[in-house]
């Protein structure tokens, strides 16, 4: 401990290792108490002194004033410890009034409401009685038989009062024992033999076959075992003594008008004392039983109200109603409760807040701090300096001097703030970049000045935003602020590793303007050899910034023979503006003039900043960014780019496009009238046509607007949008093209578009149509912000204890990563996915067999390039999901820390970073919904497949038939078209839907833009495989099929309806059968009969008895109308995935490989599908599909394990059960990333993997072996592995288990730390569970340590924790400990400690760590 004393580390918070919780026994309550309270008096109404013996009694709770007894006989510190003989008060510090407890001795026992009513009722479970019965005993005066003695009554039988009286008359007064109220329950609990119950339940569990009964037994068994293991006694759940909180925690505060404001708890205690005293007096008087019962019930209700008012049975006095008094439970739970209000979030002193304004003259590490604020915030520092320099003798005079703002004060303030970083924070703090450190620069005025480049990290703008300032006081805090939190040390975003300190808005515009080049060729191109000559020519206006010039550029390369650098020069054609920009670039071989010699938009500028950071390091990047900013601002103002009405050029072709679209829509209406297409098909075609028309107009507008004009040069609005400074193509489309289609709040698209644009102005009808989107945007913003904030909170809670605990867990497991292909195009390359990960196995070039990356080596940019050249399409890398580290993860499985670009440091809280990275964009995006103003963002449905490159076609699972026109029709439901390059590597894969027309053969070579296949995107067809005659089976008019007349067209369609609603429809199986000329059913190539089952809502395309050809469509299933998908649709999807909810219309997944067979229907509602395995020895697996749901497999189809059998999203739990963890991870990552990708947000996969790891912490036992686990029990993975290894050591059989997926809320509540779970949600439930189980909290996570007031075990605190643990061990234990769990201390000491890497300007980190 001496070692810790150096750091002042032996405070109460540090002096314990874990927290235990259990039920308090009456003895322990009395032991904690300093005296019994029998009186309800509080203070004397005249003297306002506290009354002796009352709820604030100084004799019991301690003196009201420091070192002063109540009567005033003893006053002063010297009498400390003396007990006044007159008033009986101990002379001590008044602080004890926050610690000393009292108690009430109850005349009659009462049940503790938490154990009674918190479901499942613990008292009910132990006694095996329903809650209703127990309540009737406690509140309604029913009796329970304790001991039947010689009567036919049974033990535990509940009888009413009249039955009790009757039994007494029949059997005699003493022939049996029956009691009522809490005494009865207590007596039953005392008589319980838990060990016997445990043995009985276990034997019952083995013999039972009913699943429901098994679940019930398991529930009860768990509660019984928890009681046995924890050492709690069941009768402690019935209270005979009630503790009273120390008085300073329930104070009496006098208001301005002199009336006292009483804490609600005092009201509860008074009621209890009153009723208890009254009951005591009553019992002495021997009154009628009904009076006693009533008084006992009132006492029970008073105690219930004290512990938890919300669980009371009667409705009045519920939370929120007038006169509601807060109970102890209310003080713990919710946002205003003790945990979240006072323990996890506290108000901070030495802080201030003010409006922010832009500070374009600041350096990146600086912020402008108003002098007035600085003076107040740094007051103690100034006082001490004034005293130290002898300017003032006392602190009081120093304060006066500061108040008068004497000149000396300002000089000292300058000295005090020199190199003293301050923290700036902008709410909402959605990720760690919401708080950053800066060096303050004193400024006049009252607003804080902020550097423009950090705005994107803070998500700040200057329209009235406010920011808070905090001062790190201690030297350690200042050191951490400078090294870890300084804005210059946070250049990269922790969520995707791309720079976040990048120019935006005006800066981009200035740089874009600077790199533009005149389109008009000058009469003669001037030639320059030196930049000073260019500046001279610019000054004399001989040339313009954008003029074309020739310049002699000097280059330097490394010579091939290694003799040193070679210099050469080259003439380049460029502009003065680009040369100006080139001057600020740092020198490095990776930074060539070609980077600048082009028109730079936001994309290129971001890439340049990234390249500068990767090539030249941090300090160069910071300098470069600052120079880039000032250059950008300067030329944005010089360029004179403005926003003019005439810049919005409406294309001449607009009317033509609109007319064409209108004509087509009339055509669709005619087709619909003639019954060629259905209503939904017409709607979908109309929507598509208008989308196409809007896109064409937008394209023409962009063409017109981007034309270089002799007079006005380039169009200003085009420059703003094209550079990426402000606005987007979709906003410009609305300004000068046409507004397009609008969405209703429900998400449906209104089929009449807004043809006008904002320049022309909208008519009344169009304006009214626009209001939908605008209002939806505002309502969404309010609702979704709350939703997204709650998602972030749950994510942080589930991942908070995921910390990097060691360097390498030595695992060889990992996942194969592939590039992400969506709709045939590569949306995420393999390079991006594997960058910054660690290889799980050696990676070789498949052709040359050269070793590219060793197993366990970080894949950096250079290695990614090697892998890309080698043409690998999959790489196995380590993942947080497969990490084998205990109580956290290892650095190598995590890979690169995206914020510093190097392997993650030990002690990094990667869980919280992951949660912030996933949660932060959710909030951002929801806030961004209304910017487009509700116009429908939706592409045209893809209906064909075009080759994107010259390639060779490979068809996978292609079962095709030829129709009467000679077209090849795809009959397989899992047909893929793969395009291979000349080497045979897969370049593109696209699934082709059932019913598509295929234009290529297997092995055929295709040219770029050649059509491969097409299909109808609006309907799902059912197609015949052979030629024959159609016969209706079970398609009965009015029962399973209806003629639906379309009123607008007068045409009727035959639609299949829900036949289950009819009595005679019970056993129908509506289908179309294909027969030959003799009427025999045709056999298909699979060997099965040609039966085509028809789902509800399908439209029949053939008549009974009609002849059909192979490849004909016999039924069409219309797809539902298309809805727009933005993050408002996307955020609930992300929540659904993280909560691991079963999708509403979830698909059924095949558990095995095999052939599909349709069985006999199950009652009215379900269809039976069998999957017959390939191996005949195995029995088929049965699935029940709701009738009328469209199955996407046909009889005889071969399905693989994990294939879907019907429409819908698969259930993640099914994927885990059938295909395992890797398939689940791939599915979840793909689905979550798809939502974010739609919004253009990049999140690294590893963040999602970290959250998934936390969701997969539990396993389900299906065979307990010789362990004490129960079947179906959910246990922690680490705990099972530990138990199993112990079992194997003693030669017993271990438990068998399967991994289970928990939603983030469930996982947070099931965590090993009850302190963390209680502070998250369902506080009373968690604490009840923890108390009767006698849980221990070892304080491993971050939250638990914040709550008990310690340094968190992450970052710098991680090392302090290790030192603390090592300092508590003796020499022998130390070496064992060091060798086993802490072999990584050496690697920590070598510089892996607190996220500091040498590139961050700290030359030697070992000195910072080697204590």
Curated annotation (Swiss-Prot):
Protein name in the entry: DNA-directed RNA polymerase subunit beta'
Binding site for Zn(2+) 2: 809, 883, 890, 893
Quaternary assembly: The RNAP catalytic core consists of 2 alpha, 1 beta, 1 beta' and 1 omega subunit. When a sigma factor is associated with the core the holoenzyme is formed, which can initiate transcription.
Molecular function as annotated in GO: DNA binding; DNA-directed RNA polymerase activity; magnesium ion binding; zinc ion binding
Positions bound to Mg(2+): 461, 463, 465
Residues binding Zn(2+) 1, per UniProt: 69, 71, 84, 87
Superkingdom of the organism of origin: Bacteria
GO terms of biological process kind: DNA-templated transcription
Cofactor(s) this protein cannot do without: Mg(2+); Zn(2+)
Originating organism: Ehrlichia ruminantium (strain Gardel)
EC number: 2.7.7.6
Lineage: Bacteria, Pseudomonadati, Pseudomonadota, Alphaproteobacteria, Rickettsiales
Statement: the UniProt record of this protein carries the keyword Transferase: yes
CC cofactor note: Binds 1 Mg(2+) ion per subunit. Binds 2 Zn(2+) ions per subunit.
């Amino acid at each position: 401990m001496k070692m810790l004393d150096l750091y002042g580390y032996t405070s109460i918070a540090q002096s314990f290792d874990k927290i235990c919780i259990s039920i308090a026994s009456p003895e322990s309550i009395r032991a904690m108490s300093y005296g019994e309270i029998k009186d309800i008096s509080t203070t004397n109404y005249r003297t306002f002194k506290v009354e002796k013996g009352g709820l604030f009694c100084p004799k019991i709770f301690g003196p009201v004033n420091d070192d002063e007894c109540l009567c005033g006989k003893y006053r002063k510190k010297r009498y400390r410890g003396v007990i006044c003989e007159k008033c009986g008060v101990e002379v001590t510090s008044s602080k004890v009034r926050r610690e000393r407890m009292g108690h009430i001795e109850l005349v009659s026992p009462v049940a503790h409401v938490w154990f009674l009513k918190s479901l499942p009722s613990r008292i009910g479970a132990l006694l095996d009685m329903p809650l209703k019965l127990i309540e009737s005993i406690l509140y309604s005066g029913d009796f329970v038989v304790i001991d039947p003695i010689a009567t036919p009554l049974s033990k535990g039988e509940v009888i009413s009062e009249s039955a009790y009286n009757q039994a007494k008359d029949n059997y005699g007064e003493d022939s049996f024992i029956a009691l009522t109220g809490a005494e009865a329950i207590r007596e039953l609990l005392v008589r319980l033999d838990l060990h016997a119950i445990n043995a009985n339940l276990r034997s019952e569990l083995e013999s039972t076959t009913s699943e429901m009964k098994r679940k019930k037994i398991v529930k009860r068994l768990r509660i019984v075992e928890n009681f046995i293991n924890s050492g709690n006694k069941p009768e402690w759940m019935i209270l005979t003594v009630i503790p009273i909180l120390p008085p300073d925690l329930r104070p009496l505060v006098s208001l301005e008008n002199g009336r006292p404001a009483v804490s609600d708890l005092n009201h509860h205690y008074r009621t209890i004392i009153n009723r208890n005293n009254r009951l005591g007096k009553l019992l002495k008087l021997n009154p009628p039983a009904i009076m006693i019962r009533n008084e006992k019930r009132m006492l029970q209700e008073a105690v219930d109200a004290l512990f938890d008012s919300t669980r009371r049975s009667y409705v009045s006095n519920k939370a929120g109603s007038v006169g509601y008094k807060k109970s102890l439970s209310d003080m713990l739970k919710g946002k205003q409760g003790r945990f979240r209000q006072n323990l996890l979030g506290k108000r901070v002193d030495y802080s201030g807040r003010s409006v922010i304004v832009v500070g374009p003259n600041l350096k990146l590490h600086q912020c402008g701090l108003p002098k007035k604020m600085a003076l107040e915030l740094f007051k103690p520092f100034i006082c001490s300096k004034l005293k130290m320099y002898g300017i003032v003798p006392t602190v009081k005079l120093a304060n006066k001097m500061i108040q008068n703002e004497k000149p000396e004060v300002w000089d000292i303030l300058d000295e005090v703030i020199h190199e003293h970083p301050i923290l700036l924070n902008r709410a909402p703090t959605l990720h760690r970049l919401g708080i950053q450190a800066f060096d303050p620069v004193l400024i006049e005025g009252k607003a804080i000045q902020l550097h423009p480049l950090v705005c994107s990290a803070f998500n700040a703008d200057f329209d009235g935003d406010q920011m808070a300032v905090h001062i790190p006081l201690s030297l350690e805090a200042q050191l951490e602020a400078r090294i870890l939190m300084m804005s210059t040390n946070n250049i990269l975003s922790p969520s995707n590793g791309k720079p976040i300190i990048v120019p935006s808005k005006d800066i981009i515009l200035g740089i874009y303007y600077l790199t533009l080049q005149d389109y008009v060729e000058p009469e003669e191109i001037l030639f320059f050899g030196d930049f000073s000559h260019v500046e001279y020519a610019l000054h004399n206006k001989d040339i313009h910034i954008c003029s074309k010039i020739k310049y002699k550029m000097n280059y330097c390369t490394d010579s091939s023979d290694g003799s040193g650098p070679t210099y050469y020069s080259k003439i380049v054609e460029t502009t003065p503006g680009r040369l100006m920009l080139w001057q600020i670039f740092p020198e490095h071989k990776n930074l060539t003039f070609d980077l600048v010699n082009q028109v730079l938009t936001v994309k290129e500028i971001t890439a340049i900043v990234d390249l500068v950071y990767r090539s030249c390091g941090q300090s160069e990047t910071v300098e470069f960014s600052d120079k880039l900013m000032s250059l950008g601002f300067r030329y944005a103002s010089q360029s004179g780019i403005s926003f003019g009405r005439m810049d919005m050029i409406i294309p001449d072709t607009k009317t033509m496009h609109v007319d064409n679209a209108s004509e087509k829509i009339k055509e669709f209406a005619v087709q619909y009238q003639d019954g060629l297409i259905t209503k939904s098909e017409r709607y979908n075609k109309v929507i598509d046509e208008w989308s196409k028309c809007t896109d064409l107009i937008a394209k023409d507008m962009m063409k017109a607007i981007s034309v270089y004009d002799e007079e006005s040069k380039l169009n200003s609005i085009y420059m703003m949008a094209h550079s990426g400074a402000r606005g987007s193509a979709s906003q410009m489309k609305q300004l000068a093209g046409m507004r397009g289609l609008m969405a209703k709040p429900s998400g449906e698209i209104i089929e009449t578009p807004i043809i006008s644009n904002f320049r022309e102005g909208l008519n009344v009808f169009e304006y009214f149509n626009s209001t939908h989107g605008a209002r939806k945007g505002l309502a969404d913003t309010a609702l979704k912000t709350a939703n997204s904030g709650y998602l972030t909170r749950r994510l942080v809670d589930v991942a908070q204890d995921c910390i990097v605990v060691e360097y390498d867990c030595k695992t060889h497991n990992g996942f194969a990563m592939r590039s992400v292909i969506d709709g045939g195009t590569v949306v995420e390359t393999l390079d991006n996915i594997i960058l910054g990960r660690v290889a799980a196995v050696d990676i070789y070039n498949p052709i040359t067999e050269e070793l590219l990356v060793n197993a366990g080596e970080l894949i950096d940019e250079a290695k990614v390039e090697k892998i890309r050249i080698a043409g690998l399409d999959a790489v196995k890398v380590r993942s947080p999901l497969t990490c084998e580290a205990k109580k956290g993860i290892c650095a190598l499985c995590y890979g690169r820390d995206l914020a510093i670009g190097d392997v993650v440091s030990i002690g990094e809280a990667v869980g919280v970073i992951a949660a912030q990275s996933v949660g932060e964009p959710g909030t951002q995006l929801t806030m961004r919904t209304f910017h487009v103003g509700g116009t429908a963002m939706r592409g045209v449905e893809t209906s064909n497949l075009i080759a994107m490159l010259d390639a060779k076609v490979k068809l996978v699972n292609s079962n095709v038939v030829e129709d009467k026109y000679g077209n090849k029709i795809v009959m397989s439901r899992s047909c893929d078209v793969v395009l291979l390059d000349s080497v045979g590597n897969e370049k593109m894969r696209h699934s082709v839907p059932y019913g598509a027309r295929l234009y290529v053969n297997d092995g055929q070579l295709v040219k770029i833009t050649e059509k491969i296949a097409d299909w109808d995107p609006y309907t799902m067809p059912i197609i015949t495989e052979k030629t024959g005659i159609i016969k209706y089976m079970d398609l009965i008019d009015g029962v399973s099929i209806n003629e639906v007349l379309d009123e607008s067209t007068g045409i009727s369609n035959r639609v299949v309806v829900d036949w289950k609603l009819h009595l005679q429809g019970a056993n129908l199986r509506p289908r179309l059968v294909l027969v030959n000329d003799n009427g025999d059913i045709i056999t298909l190539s699979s060997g099965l009969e040609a039966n085509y089952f028809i789902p509800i809502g399908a439209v029949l395309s053939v008549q009974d008895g009609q002849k059909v050809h192979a490849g004909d469509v016999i039924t069409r299933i219309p797809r539902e109308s298309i809805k727009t998908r933005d993050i408002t649709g996307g955020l609930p999807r992300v929540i659904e995935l993280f909560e691991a909810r079963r999708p509403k219309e979830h698909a059924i997944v095949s558990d095995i490989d095999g052939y599909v067979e349709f069985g006999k229907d199950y009652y009215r509602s379900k269809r039976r599908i069998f999957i017959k395995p390939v191996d005949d020895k195995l029995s088929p697996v049965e699935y029940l599909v709701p009738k009328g749901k469209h199955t996407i497999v046909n009889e005889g189809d071969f399905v693989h394990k994990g294939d879907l059998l019907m429409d819908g999203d698969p259930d993640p739990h099914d994927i885990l059960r059938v295909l395992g963890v890797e398939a689940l991870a791939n599915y979840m990552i793909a689905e979550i990333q798809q939502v974010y990708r739609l919004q253009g947000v990049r999140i690294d996969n590893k963040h999602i993997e970290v959250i998934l790891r936390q969701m997969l912490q539990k396993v389900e036992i299906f065979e307990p072996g010789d362990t004490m686990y129960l079947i179906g029990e959910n246990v922690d993975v680490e705990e099972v592995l530990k138990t199993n290894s112990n079992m194997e050591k003693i030669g017993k059989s271990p438990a068998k288990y399967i991994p289970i997926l928990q939603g983030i809320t469930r996982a947070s509540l099931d965590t090993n730390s009850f302190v963390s779970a209680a502070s998250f949600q369902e506080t009373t439930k968690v604490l009840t569970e923890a108390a009767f189980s006698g849980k221990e909290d070892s304080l491993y996570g971050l939250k638990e340590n914040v709550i008990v007031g310690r340094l968190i075990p992450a970052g710098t605190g991680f090392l302090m924790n290790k030192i603390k643990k090592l300092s508590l061990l003796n020499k022998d234990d130390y070496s064992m400990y060091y060798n086993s769990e802490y072999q990584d201390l050496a690697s920590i000491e070598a510089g892996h400690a607190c996220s500091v890497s040498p590139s961050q300007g700290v030359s030697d980190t070992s000195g910072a760590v080697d204590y």
